[in-house]
Amino acid sequence: MSAAAQLKSVDYEVFGRVQGVCFRMYTEGEAKKIGVVGWVKNTSKGTVTGQVQGPEEKVNSMKSWLSKVGSPSSRIDRTNFSNEKSISKLEYSNFSIRY
């Protein structure tokens, strides 16, 4: 990673059939493959929420995955992104599933 890479942080919420379809496990796997950190968890209202941090281009790749791909048996209706901002350092050391 070049020193010039701008670090970004963004919160997300995924709507659709995203619980009971291994969405969190696949999200964790994709995040580790891309090289971003943060977390993912199910909400009580049937969505999946979390935060992604990393170099801007990697965060953008993860945003695309969260919007269009997901786990094999999921159905993503929409994904909302919020609180997107530049950060000076990562707040997490890895990507984890929260409960």
Curated annotation (Swiss-Prot):
Keywords: Acetylation, Hydrolase, Phosphoprotein. PROSITE patterns: ACYLPHOSPHATASE_1, ACYLPHOSPHATASE_2, ACYLPHOSPHATASE_3. The active site is at 24, 42. Residues 9-99 form the Acylphosphatase-like domain. The modification N-acetylserine is found at residue 2. It comes from the Eukaryota. GO terms for molecular function: acylphosphatase activity. Gene3D superfamilies: 3.30.70.100. SUPFAM superfamilies: Acylphosphatase/BLUF domain-like. It catalyses: an acyl phosphate + H2O = a carboxylate + phosphate + H(+). Its EC number is 3.6.1.7. The modification Phosphoserine is found at residue 93. Its physiological role is not yet clear. PANTHER family: ACYLPHOSPHATASE, ACYLPHOSPHATASE-2. Belongs to the acylphosphatase family. This is Acylphosphatase-2.
